[in-house]
């Protein structure tokens, strides 16, 4: 009997694994505004959220790829923005150079993001300057224009990144 209990105990201890649940993070993000004007990314006039940056050599610089955050002209809240400022705050893997590689092998490469028609033209988005301002009236006309440019580091490989933005109208 003792032997049966001992064998049962050994068998149970071998099959009992860790019962610890997986941990994770949840991010909550929102904005409170009296006026809303939803924007959609557009690349070469086509709605989309993937910007193809092309291929660059190590330490090379890619072409500037233009894109805009634009609202449909028939969206109700956008019409009341003509005298306001739109502050766009970017978040993601921001460094002092730009957006860092998040999933590719070219880990010392980055994307330089600059305004085209912001209140400060050519303003770079980086960790110390993640908010850029635009005349809000541009939301339904030309949109809030940017360029994205891949800057190659020393390590060859693929580059993958993502960024989020939030718009506050003042």
UniProtKB/Swiss-Prot annotation:
The lineage of its organism: Bacteria, Pseudomonadati, Pseudomonadota, Gammaproteobacteria, Enterobacterales. It comes from the Bacteria. Disulfide bonds join 37-78. This is F107 fimbrial protein. GO terms for cellular component: pilus. Keywords: Disulfide bond, Fimbrium, Signal. Belongs to the fimbrial protein family. One of its GO terms (biological process) is cell adhesion. Fimbriae (also called pili), polar filaments radiating from the surface of the bacterium to a length of 0.5-1.5 micrometers and numbering 100-300 per cell, enable bacteria to colonize the epithelium of specific host organs.
């Amino acid at each position: 009997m003792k032997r049966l209990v001992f064998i049962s105990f050994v068998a149970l201890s071998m099959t009992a694994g860790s019962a610890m649940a997986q941990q994770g993070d949840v991010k909550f993000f929102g904005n409170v505004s009296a006026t809303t004007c939803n924007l959609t990314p557009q690349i070469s006039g086509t709605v989309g959220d993937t910007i193809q940056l092309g291929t660059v050599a190590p330490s090379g610089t890619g072409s500037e790829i233009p894109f805009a955050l634009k609202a449909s002209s028939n969206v109700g809240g956008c019409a009341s923005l003509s005298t306001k400022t739109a502050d766009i705050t970017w978040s993601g893997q921001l460094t002092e150079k730009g957006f860092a590689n998040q999933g590719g092998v070219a880990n010392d490469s980055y994307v330089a993001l600059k305004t085209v028609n912001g209140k400060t033209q050519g303003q770079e988005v980086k960790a110390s300057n993640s908010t850029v301002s635009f005349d809000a009236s541009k939301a339904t006309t030309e949109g809030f224009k940017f360029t994205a440019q891949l800057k190659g580091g020393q390590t060859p490989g693929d580059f993958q990144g993502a960024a989020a933005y939030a718009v506050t109208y003042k």
